[in-house]
UniProtKB/Swiss-Prot annotation:
Membrane topology: Multi-pass membrane protein
Subunit description: The cytochrome bc1 complex contains 11 subunits: 3 respiratory subunits (MT-CYB, CYC1 and UQCRFS1), 2 core proteins (UQCRC1 and UQCRC2) and 6 low-molecular weight proteins (UQCRH/QCR6, UQCRB/QCR7, UQCRQ/QCR8, UQCR10/QCR9, UQCR11/QCR10 and a cleavage product of UQCRFS1). This cytochrome bc1 complex then forms a dimer.
Location(s) in or outside the cell: Mitochondrion inner membrane
Keywords, sorted A to Z: Electron transport, Heme, Iron, Membrane, Metal-binding, Mitochondrion, Mitochondrion inner membrane, Respiratory chain, Transmembrane, Transmembrane helix, Transport, Ubiquinone
Main localization category: mitochondrion
Cellular component terms (Gene Ontology): mitochondrial inner membrane; respiratory chain complex III
Pfam families found in the cross-reference section: Cytochrom_B_C (PF00032), Cytochrome_B (PF00033)
Residue stretches spanning the membrane: 33-53, 77-98, 113-133, 178-198, 226-246, 288-308, 320-340, 347-367
Species per Swiss-Prot/TrEMBL record: Sminthopsis granulipes
Protein name: Cytochrome b
A Gene Ontology biological process term: mitochondrial electron transport, ubiquinol to cytochrome c
Protein origin, superkingdom: Eukaryota
Length: 381
């Protein structure tokens, strides 16, 4: 009997994507994060669906509905903790996935990379609108500060901000539409993930050496399914440890207080995964300049493929580029730390220097480093 997975129209697609897919024989654990992101997305959609069954998107009842989920709904506390900390795991995997792409030159698959950047932006938008939903103090003021940035756009800014708000400030209309956005966006993300995989399977995976791996491929199953299963065990271990032992450690204490438009928290800040971009935003004294720098900090990923000057794809054998990459990593950690600090010296100047270094490394230092490495590899005799 002919194998059904190779003949059935639907099973054939799954077979070519996850079972008989030819994969490079040397891809390391850094290639696990794609599948882990897929698992994170499934966890977020499922836990989110169960939360949406009990949540009410009204300013009067949103906060108490979240409290009701945690107190009265069967395992509601667990579902909520998994959803909140699942977002942190999602972004941890995202940052590592993007970092892997930069280190090993995966960005040279331009279509896959561009869809990936769009995915990153969409996930960030989803996380932002989701953070507003519990209607705690930091939720409300975070929404107010970030949506208010739209008013920096010349001429149409104020109108645009009021259009997003559905009024003259963040209120009931804003919360209702943010809930609608938060519900629909994960399904848009799922569609984009399919397109991301479609483009990836057009070219095949990159590998640590950056050399064309066509001469040495192995089937995805069982080799990489078992390897991904190990990654999944680690992911679940960290997620469950967070959700069960310290579920509020990554959240903001201000969100234990219901939103109060008359009382501004002393230090407004987003969740930890946005702090690097928030630090760049704050490091520029001008409002419009800050907004442009914020956008540039993410959209700069789109220009990375055009700044690749090295003859080698991967940084595996390029020590100068490696050094710059790890300086960039340390710089991003510094920006994350600065984003969580109050706006006072010495944090202001550290944030400004780190922001300048971020753009300098990517735009000015990395391209010549690649060219210099090419020169060093040329025979000199």
């Amino acid at each position: 009997m002919i194998n059904l997975r190779k003949t059935h129209p639907l099973m054939k697609i799954i077979n070519h994507s996850f079972i008989d897919l030819p994969a490079p024989s040397n891809i390391s654990a850094w290639w696990n994060f794609g599948s882990l992101l897929g698992i994170c997305l499934v966890i977020q959609i499922l836990t989110g669906l169960f939360l949406a069954m009990h949540y009410t998107s009204d300013t009067m009842t949103a906060f108490s509905s979240v409290a009701h989920i945690c107190r009265d709904v069967n395992y509601g506390w667990l579902i909520r903790n998994l959803h909140a900390n699942g977002a942190s795991m999602f972004f941890m995997c995202l940052f590592l996935h993007v970092g892997r792409g930069i280190y090993y030159g995966s960005y040279l698959y331009k279509e896959t990379w561009n869809i990936g950047v769009i995915l990153l932006l969409t996930v960030m938008a989803t996380a932002f609108v989701g953070y507003v939903l519990p209607w705690g103090q930091m939720s409300f003021w975070g929404a107010t500060v970030i949506t208010n940035l739209l008013s920096a756009i010349p001429y149409i800014g104020t109108t645009l901000a009021e259009w997003i708000w559905g009024g003259f400030s963040v209120d009931k209309a804003t919360l209702t539409r943010f809930f609608a956005f938060h519900f629909i966006l994960p399904f848009i993300i799922t569609a984009l993930v399919i397109v991301h995989l479609l483009f990836l399977h057009e070219t095949g995976s990159n590998n640590p050496s950056g050399i064309n791996p066509d001469s040495d491929k192995i089937p995805f199953h069982p080799y990489y399914t078992i390897k991904d299963a190990l990654g999944l065990m680690f992911l679940l271990l960290v997620l469950l440890s967070l959700a069960l032992f310290s579920p509020d450690s990554l959240g903001d204490p201000d969100n234990f207080s219901p939103a109060n438009p008359l009382n501004t928290p002393p230090h407004i800040k987003p969740e930890w995964y946005f702090l690097f971009a928030y630090a760049i935003l704050r490091s520029i004294p001008n409002k419009l300049g800050g907004v442009l720098a914020l956008l540039a900090s993410i959209l700069i990923l789109l220009v990375i493929p055009f700044l690749h000057t090295a003859n080698q794809r991967s940084m595996m054998f390029r020590p100068i580029s490696q050094t710059l990459f790890w300086i960039l990593t340390a710089n991003l950690i510094t920006l994350t730390w600065i984003g969580g600090q109050p706006v006072e010296q010495p944090f202001i100047i550290i944030g400004q220097l780190a922001s300048i270094l971020y753009f300098t490394l990517i735009l000015i230092l990395m391209p010549p480093a690649g060219m210099f490495e090419n020169y060093m590899l040329e025979p000199k005799w």
